[in-house]
Regions:
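Basic helix-extension-helix modules of the SAP/HeH family
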Residues: 127-157, 168-171, 187-190, 201-205, ...
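Repeat-associated, polar segments at repeat-unit boundaries in modular proteins
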Residues: 178, 183-223, 293-323, 327
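A contiguous, surface-oriented mixed alpha/beta subdomain in the mid-to-C-terminal portion of proteins
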Residues: 18-37, 49-52, 239-248, 271, ...
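Long amphipathic all-alpha helical oligomerization modules
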Residues: 64-80, 115-124, 268, 273-323
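Conserved nucleotidyltransferase catalytic core and NTase-mimicking acidic/glycine-rich helix/loop elements
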Residues: 1-125
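A cross-kingdom feature marking solvent-exposed beta-strand/loop segments within repeated
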Residues: 149-173, 179-184, 195-197, 262, ...
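Short, solvent-exposed interaction modules
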Residues: 206-283
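Short, structured motif recognition centered on aromatic/hydrophobic residues
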Residues: 170-186, 229-236, 278-281, 285-294
Length: 333
């Protein structure tokens, strides 16, 4: 993507502006070759020898569309028309890269996505367990820096519990979600934006509304559309948590209250926590999370159960049912 951007997108017009038509032509044809290779990479295929690139591209529907756009670039039209054709192809690629989960937005200048592409490529060989572990460690580092009005919270020193709670959730996610969230969190953290701090701040809209009014300007504003999506997701997950609570009351009794109306200044409900967390997600991450929730709904499964299953196994139980039975016995003694 960066090579296509540096040759056809950037240096082609730059060389033309200098009056160097020979180098401009070289940049354009280099860019065409890089575009053919990029289409192969997007499809998860290794590009063949240069002489077979075009034919190989045309084996897929997306490749055929890219080839048509490349034909426009190579048609030998006026420089302005060629530059417009290059931008049209760049827009096509940004859409394909976004759709496949490689990038978080559709900025058509492809070099703008280099950092994200390199970061996600470096995560490619890691297992889901390793990705979940890396996210939890980065979050705990960020959590350590959160300043509480009442002083440092004891849970900020409890890596064991924090690790289990976070990984239990992340191990229900797919690789695309894990890579996206890890990239988002890493990027924001190294820009000085602590998503854990933002999450707890957003929760205060319910638990400490007066304080929230003082701090809300520090958080990115959520669009009406994003708020609506979050509320749809929250509604589904609260329903699933209610269902889980009915079936496994002993386990649920050791977790958070479920509903926002149960919030106090000291206790934050599952609903409020979830709403705060989703409010920190990037547009791309929320899109992926929404698909994940839809998939659960379509399959008639419950993410609350799967998350709790991961959690109790990390605590040494065989299953949710085993944990429920043993905890109920202890409570009865």
């Amino acid at each position: 993507a960066a090579r296509f951007a540096q040759t056809a997108q950037y240096n082609y017009t730059r060389m033309l502006d200098r009056g160097d038509t020979l180098t401009a032509g070289m940049m354009l044809w280099e860019g065409i070759k890089e575009a053919m290779k990029l289409q192969h990479y997007i499809e998860g295929r290794y590009p063949l020898h240069d002489k077979w690139l075009l034919r190989s591209m045309q084996e897929s529907e997306a490749g055929q569309r890219a080839a048509e756009l490349l034909q426009e670039i190579g048609a030998g039209g006026a420089a302005q028309e060629t530059a417009m054709a290059v931008e049209k192809l760049a827009g096509f690629f940004s859409g394909e890269l976004y759709r496949e989960g490689f990038i978080s937005d559709t900025d058509s200048y492809l070099d703008a996505h280099s950092e994200e592409l390199i970061f996600k490529a470096s995560m490619g060989a890691k297992s889901r367990d390793a990705l979940a572990e890396e996210i939890a460690k980065l979050e705990f580092e960020a959590f350590d820096k959160v300043k509480n009005e009442g002083g440092r919270a004891s849970c900020q020193n409890d890596w064991g519990t924090f690790s289990i709670m976070r990984k239990s959730q992340y191990l229900t996610w797919n690789r695309g979600m894990l890579q996206q969230y890890l990239y988002d969190f890493y990027r924001e953290y190294h820009r000085g934006h602590n998503l854990i701090e933002e999450k707890y701040g957003r929760m205060m809209e319910s638990t400490a509304p007066e304080k929230y009014e003082e701090i809300k300007s520090h958080f990115p504003e959520l669009t009406a559309e994003k708020k609506a999506i979050i509320e749809q997701i929250v509604g589904l997950q609260v329903g699933w948590m209610e269902e889980f609570s009915c079936r496994y009351p002993s386990l649920a009794g050791n977790a958070r209250y479920i509903h926002t109306y149960e919030d106090t200044a000291e206790d934050t409900s599952y609903e409020t926590y979830l709403r705060g967390e989703l409010g920190t997600y990037s547009d791309k991450m929320l899109e992926l999370y929404g698909r994940y929730i839809v998939e659960y709904a379509q399959n008639g499964k419950n993410p609350a159960y799967d998350t709790m299953e991961n959690s109790v196994k990390m605590y040494g139980y065989d299953s949710v049912e085993d944990a429920e039975q043993k905890i109920a016995q202890w409570e009865a003694e």
